[in-house]
Amino acid sequence: MKSKTQKLKKGLYIVSTPIGNLKDITFRAIDILKKSDIILCEDTRNSKKLLTHYEIKSKLVSYHKFNERKISKEIFSEIHKYNIISLISDAGTPVISDPGKILIKECVLKNMPIVPIPGVSSVTATASI
């Protein structure tokens, strides 16, 4: 069993968030978000609801289709400042239909680890009934 105080490796964490009910999030996702140096999100107003609910005080930066290139460039120009970068969407798993592909491509080019943090699956919930 791993220690509760286990350090996270430096990298980009793709963190799934609840689709509707704020309680539909994994303990691991909450832990990653609390340990993040910076959280990139689509809409800070929506994300603040989730982060406030779980007392997550990490720096929050708006990251959407209109500023994706600019923010990705800024993040990588200051990458030495960040160990844990998390990417979240307003609901569900980032990058599926949300921004993030540019950031992921940059991480791959710079050999920066990318870690997916899965969420609660509505597909398996539906299949169970």
Regions flagged by a language model, labelled:
Residues D24-I25, L50-L51, S72, I96-P99, ...:
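Short glycine-/acidic-enriched loop or helix-start segments at secondary-structure transitions
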Residues E42-R45, F66-N67, A91, P118-S121:
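Short beta->alpha linker loops
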Residues M1-F66:
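Glycine-rich, flexible N-terminal cofactor/catalytic loop recognition
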Residues H80-I129:
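Short glycine-cluster motifs
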Residues N67-F76:
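Glycine-rich, highly charged phosphate/nucleotide-binding loops
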Residues I56, E68, H80-I84:
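Generic short alpha-helical segment signal, independent of protein family or function
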Residues R28-D31, H53-I56, I75-S77, P99-I104, ...:
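Short, glycine/charged-enriched secondary-structure capping and boundary segments
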